[in-house]
């Protein structure tokens, strides 16, 4: 017989209490966690001890208002409640204008806005809160997504649509400078710091970052890339996406719109696609498209970028080698459809979604429906909208009216059902960002985060690490001890997309001077004069050493035949004077490489040569004076001379050119991607 087990009342009570405790712990693990709810207009609904916003004010907890439900279900419910007009409005993103906001929100149904003014974090947050309140009053209470171009980098001058704000958040070197640090952990830290600053200020979407591979040295927008290496660009792209967004998009994320797909580096002779004369992308080297242009975008896609920005450039069949699989060709003789990226179904749907696995939405660049509608100039506005939607576009940049899209539906160029999947992607982003629950922020906290000394210290570290020592064969550096120093800064005029000397283009923003730690000789002298061991002299004859900082800008020839990167008065450099200074005294020549300039006339005469990439002067002087040993590496290959530039393949990075492309100095070092010295060698 099996033994009989008896249970006492005490043992039964103990077993029950344990079971209840286990059940309670399991329930706690599975119970929904209440997110922070801030409803300044919409009333709150209570379900037990949980709170929800009654965004449509009908007294019922609708599925789209229920944060416990999966995002896809919330999206589907909200879509079913939206009118055609509301869907079309959601597919527009325009520059923010407080005076027009009520009209934009309630008549045009726009919810995506680009911030282009250079305000403090406190001001941005306060204004965003006011705007979000107005959005919460709307029929369905759909919140606003505020977007911005990058605003955490040193810029001498601010440029519309590229770098419209600087100096109000932590101030880092330019993106080329971040690449030059050769420190992927520091780049990730930058992204995480910027994310916290942006989100606190009420900005939830970044028009960036720009991961185009810089293959054509004359291209104006190299300044805002991470350089010429597809591999290094891909590593950086991954960290930028993960740093800004996190492993998944959430209430603390800043959504990225990685640009400019499929890569704007291979422009014709450096001419920029913001202008009709620069519209062509050329791929003369067979296989270059997949080998060099796409890896950074693939890395961003794999990291989960929320959106991708297409560009204006129009792929040239006449000047391109074989790039695409034959089954993607338009015909036996036509490889590419020669239209701007926003209209190119092969690139956006077959390549980006089909082959690369992109799950987010496509955001056009500004003006693709109007001035930059390359290849579709003969189409009406509704036809352009229809072609772009069919190609795979969800969000039209700087379009302040959905009327053309509505007309496309009314003219039966599109069905409302064509808009639905694109609107679903946009709504998914807004839900994931947590904006339906809490679109508001604390303006004082925002300012505190933006002014963090710890963030400023990490940014200063990046400035110092970004500086590249190219030559020091005379051991002039570090420049320690007492010195009589002659100082000169030579700077080009602010360039625009049209460039200096060119017609058209979007130029410097009036009254905005960026973050000029040094905007000229006087500013640099003032900074140096704080060191009591340095005596600034006004004449080269009085000096025992000279410091010359060249800060050129690209010159766009009026004939629009090519962009000029040779150092000359046209790019802001008096070459004869530089050579005169170098001949008179040992000279530290510092060159700000926002493009890979042609330096063969000024480099040989210097005693030491350094490269900067939009850096604070304080960081440069720390390296010059020996307070920090240089560790930076070139993110670009510097061309040997004008002949090398003229011969370069615009779709191939400088380090991979098929001829002796790189500049070689007098000690036989080549200034190629990844090169950089330090004081110990």
Describe every region a protein language model picked out.
Residues 1-2, 295:
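Accessible peptide chain termini
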Residues 11-23:
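Bacterial N-terminal signal peptides
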Residues 2-14:
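Bacterial N-terminal signal peptides that target proteins for export
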């Amino acid at each position: 017989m099996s033994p009989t087990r008896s249970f006492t009342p005490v043992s039964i009570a103990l077993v029950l209490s344990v079971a209840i405790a286990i059940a309670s712990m399991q329930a706690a693990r599975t119970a929904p966690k209440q997110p922070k709810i801030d409803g300044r207009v919409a009333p709150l609904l209570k379900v037990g001890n949980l709170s929800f916003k009654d965004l449509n004010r009908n007294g019922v907890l609708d599925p789209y208002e229920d944060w416990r439900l999966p995002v896809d279900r919330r999206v589907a419910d909200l879509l079913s409640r939206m009118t055609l007009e509301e869907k079309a409005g959601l597919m527009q993103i325009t520059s923010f204008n407080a005076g027009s906001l009520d009209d934009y929100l309630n008549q045009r149904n726009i919810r995506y806005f680009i911030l282009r003014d250079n305000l403090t974090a406190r001001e941005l947050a306060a204004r965003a809160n006011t705007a979000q309140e107005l959005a919460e009053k709307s029929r369905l209470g759909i919140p606003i997504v505020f977007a911005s171009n990058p605003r955490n980098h040193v810029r001498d001058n601010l440029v519309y649509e590229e770098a419209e704000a600087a100096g109000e958040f932590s101030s880092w070197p330019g993106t080329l400078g971040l690449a030059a640090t050769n420190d992927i952990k520091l780049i990730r830290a930058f992204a995480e710091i910027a994310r916290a600053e942006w989100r606190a200020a009420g900005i939830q979407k970044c028009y960036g970052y720009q991961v185009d591979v810089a293959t054509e040295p004359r291209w104006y927008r190299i300044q805002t890339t991470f350089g010429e290496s597809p591999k290094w660009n891909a590593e950086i792209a991954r960290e930028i996406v993960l740093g800004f967004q996190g492993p998944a998009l959430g209430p603390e994320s800043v959504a990225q719109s990685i640009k400019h797909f499929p890569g704007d580096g291979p422009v014709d002779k450096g001419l920029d696609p913001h202008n009709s004369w620069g519209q062509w992308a050329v791929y003369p080297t067979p296989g270059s498209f997949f080998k060099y242009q796409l890896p950074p975008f693939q890395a961003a896609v794999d990291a989960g970028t929320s959106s991708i920005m297409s560009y204006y450039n129009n792929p040239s069949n006449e000047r391109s080698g074989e790039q695409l699989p034959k089954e993607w060709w338009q015909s036996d003789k036509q490889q590419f459809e020669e239209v701007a990226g926003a209209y190119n179904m092969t690139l956006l749907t077959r390549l980006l979604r089909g082959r690369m696995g992109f799950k987010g939405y496509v955001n056009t660049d500004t003006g693709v429906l109007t001035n930059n509608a390359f290849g579709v100039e003969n189409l009406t506005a509704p036809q352009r909208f229809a072609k772009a939607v069919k190609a795979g576009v969800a969000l039209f940049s700087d379009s302040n009216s959905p009327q053309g899209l509505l007309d496309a539906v009314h003219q039966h160029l599109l069905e409302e059902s064509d808009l639905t999947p694109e609107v679903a992607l946009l709504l998914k982003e807004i839900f994931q960002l947590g904006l339906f629950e809490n679109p508001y922020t604390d303006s004082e906290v925002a300012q505190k985060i933006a002014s963090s000394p710890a963030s400023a210290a990490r940014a200063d570290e990046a400035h110092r690490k970004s500086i590249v020592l190219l030559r020091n064969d005379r051991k002039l550096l570090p420049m320690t001890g007492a010195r009589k120093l002659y100082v000169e800064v030579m700077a080009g005029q602010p360039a625009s997309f049209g460039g200096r000397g060119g017609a058209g283009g979007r130029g410097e923003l009036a009254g905005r001077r960026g973050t000029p730690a040094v905007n000229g000789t006087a500013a640099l002298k003032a900074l140096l004069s704080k060191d009591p061991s340095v005596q600034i002299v006004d004449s080269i004859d009085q000096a025992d050493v000279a410091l010359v900082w060249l800060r050129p800008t690209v010159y766009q020839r009026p004939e629009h035949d090519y962009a000029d990167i040779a150092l000359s008065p046209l790019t802001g450099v008096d070459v004869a004077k530089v050579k005169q200074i170098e001949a008179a005294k040992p000279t530290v020549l510092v060159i700000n490489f926002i493009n890979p300039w042609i330096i063969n006339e000024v480099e040989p005469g210097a005693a030491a040569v350094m490269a900067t990439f939009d850096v604070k002067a304080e960081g440069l002087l720390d390296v010059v004076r020996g307070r920090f040993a240089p560790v930076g590496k070139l993110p670009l290959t510097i061309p040997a001379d004008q002949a090398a530039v003229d011969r370069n393949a615009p779709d191939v990075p400088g380090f991979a050119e098929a001829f002796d492309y790189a500049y070689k100095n007098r000690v036989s070092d080549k200034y190629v991607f990844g090169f950089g010295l330090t004081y110990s060698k």
